Amino acid sequence: MFNSDVRSLLAVGIDLVSLASSAKRVGYQVYAADYFGDLDLQSICIKYKSVIQQKPAKSCGRFELDFKPEVFLRLTKSLLQENKIDAILLSSGLDDYFDILCELNDLVPILGNSPQTVESVREKPKFFEELKRLGIPHPETAMVTDVKEAKKIAAEIGYPVVIKPSRGFGGMGVRIAKSPQELKREFQEVLVFDNSILIQKHVNGAHASISFLASHNVVKILTINEQLMGVPYTFQSEPFGYCGNIVPFHSANLISERCEHIAEKIALHFGLIGSNGIDLVISKENVPYVIEINPRFQGTLECVERVLRIDLVKAHVNACVHGFLPMMQKKNLTFSTRLILYAPERVLVPDLTIFEEARDIPLPKTVIEKGEPLCSIVTEGSSRDYSLQKAKKIAKSIYGTLSPVSNL
């Protein structure tokens, strides 16, 4: 159990603005070991270190080429040389790098799931074997290393199949194959992301997620969320790339009981604690199929806070340190949308702080490469459509401010 006197927190990962903001809002001293080094994160933190050093007229590079998880260790060590930090809060990016998590945890304790617990829910296909034992719906999954083995497994599972890297996040490198010919072609594309590949039965349905909090013996669903994947109007180039979310999921009432059962069974069986997420596909029969666990803060963070009017970092600390979960008050139904925008071409970015709803804001006059993250937008409204249309309208305005840049 953590010492209850936690005052300073280090946010670590690639999606930190909302997490750092939530921590600062309730009085914590906030530090960050970040990837992008965005403008709004700099203004929140006492001190931060980032992989990318954003500068006017300089490219922010390409994530898939520049992302190296071990760099977060170096950034953390650098911050610890001059600052006293009590605990780490994890965002996305390091879920599948268990050695890195262990080393981070040795430097500063991770407030939340231990590296061993993270490994137990992220190591596939062992995790899916446990789900089968628990009777939790999930797509049939196998790990392969070559296309011959992939074809054999796909024939046994039955087409269509999903091909994905065994390690990754944000839907990067995920493909669908409807035949052995497609499998051969798509397999080579996925190999770029990882040498170990998952072949998974494709479940046709709506992409969703569960956000929940857990203490050592109690689990509470916060929200069921709609996931936005591969949305064309955000210029996301990956077919299953994460483009944001809408909270809550529009048909949440039809699946809430099943989702509660799934979250409780998984959290208690694996010993999950604090803020966690479960990615799902909801079939046409309204059966939630578990796709993966996100055993740390999720990209839905600010939307969940807006809908429930809670502070998620405070709730996470209370769950992990004190063992209690927040009371949920009945409120008027609010919908909150987060859109992640990607560069439609190589662009020069203006000052995006003029957009109140913009988050993850790059420094003015930096260069963003085609298909790379540009910024995100968070809106809310009394209906799903109003919230989404508001976000799309702001996205259109932001895209209108960008200036194309040549590759010279």
Feature locations, PLM:
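ATP-binding N-terminal substructure of ATP-dependent carboxylate-amine bond-forming enzymes
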Residues: 1-122, 126, 133, 145-152, ...
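Peripheral (often C-terminal) accessory segments that flank ATP-dependent C-N-forming ligase machineries
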Residues: 10, 150, 314-408
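Structural element of the ATP-grasp superfamily
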Residues: 127-132, 199, 316
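Conserved ATP-binding module of the ATP-grasp superfamily
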Residues: 137-139, 160-162, 174-209, 224, ...
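Short beta-strand-to-turn element immediately C-terminal to the catalytic PLP-Schiff-base lysine
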Residues: 144, 174-179, 212-215, 249, ...
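ATP-dependent carboxylate/phosphate-activation module, predominantly the ATP-grasp catalytic core
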Residues: 204-208, 212-271, 294-318, 330-331
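Short acidic-glycine loop/turn motifs at beta-strand connectors
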Residues: 214-219, 283-286, 321, 344, ...
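A short glycine-rich, hydrophobically flanked beta-strand micro-motif that places a catalytic Asp/Glu
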Residues: 272-285, 328
